[in-house]
């Protein structure tokens, strides 16, 4: 019990509340159907030769903060001026897409669907059309959601829009249980929209990703 109490003190001092007594750097990782104490290996693979051009071993169990870091390292390793990086939805993070854009790297990663409204069968954000000229959204009922204010959430600056016509709208049950349907837009969301357009115009991108980044692992296992 005394030894466990000492470990508890150490545990409370660690950022992610984890201590591995066997390997100090290892962390608990989520895997399909189970978990493992180990590492998360990041690889960047070129589409031409299916060679790993850059890799990194991390002890974070999610990939969301790795896209721009790996993309920049891959570009440097390949000595390339231009780079298109394709990743799965596990790498989608607004700040990472922005970082790639600012580094002149073209990123393609599907958005993660986290909308409660969509999950409940109501109108999703995609059903609200932005009018950039007027800085307002048009809802499925044809009403205008005008800009109301800006706010900071999780470090991101968001613009908030809503309409005053929601209470009497015939589509309200299909839209929101709240008094108004509010739409929030990140200040750099135009970059995400442009990326989605790239993905729509290149529907085979995810197939290319699977054939590329998974290829070396298949070779190693074989």
In which residue ranges do the predicted regions lie?
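Anion-binding and metal-coordination hotspots
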Residues: 1-222
């Amino acid at each position: 019990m005394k030894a466990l109490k000492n470990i508890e003190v150490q545990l409370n001092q660690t950022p992610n509340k984890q201590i591995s007594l066997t390997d100090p750097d290892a962390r608990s990782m989520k895997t399909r159907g189970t978990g493992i104490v180990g590492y998360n290996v990041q690889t960047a693979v070129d589409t031409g030769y299916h060679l790993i051009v850059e890799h990194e071993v991390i002890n974070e169990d999610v990939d969301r903060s790795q896209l721009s870091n790996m993309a920049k390292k891959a570009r440097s390793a390949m000595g390339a001026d231009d780079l298109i990086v394709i990743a799965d939805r596990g790498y989608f993070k607004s700040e990472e897409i922005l970082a790639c854009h600012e580094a002149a790297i073209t990123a393609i990663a599907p958005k993660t669907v986290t909308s409660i409204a969509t999950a409940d069968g109501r109108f999703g954000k995609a059903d609200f059309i932005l009018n950039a000229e007027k800085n307002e959204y048009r809802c499925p009922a044809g009403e205008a959601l005008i800009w109301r204010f800006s706010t900071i959430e999780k470090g991101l600056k968001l613009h908030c829009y809503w309409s005053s016509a929601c209470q009497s709208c015939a589509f309200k049950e299909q839209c929101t249980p709240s008094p108004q349907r509010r739409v929030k837009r990140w200040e750099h969301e135009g970059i995400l929209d442009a990326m989605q357009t790239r993905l729509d115009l290149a529907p085979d991108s995810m197939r290319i990703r699977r054939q590329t980044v998974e290829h070396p692992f298949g070779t190693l296992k074989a």
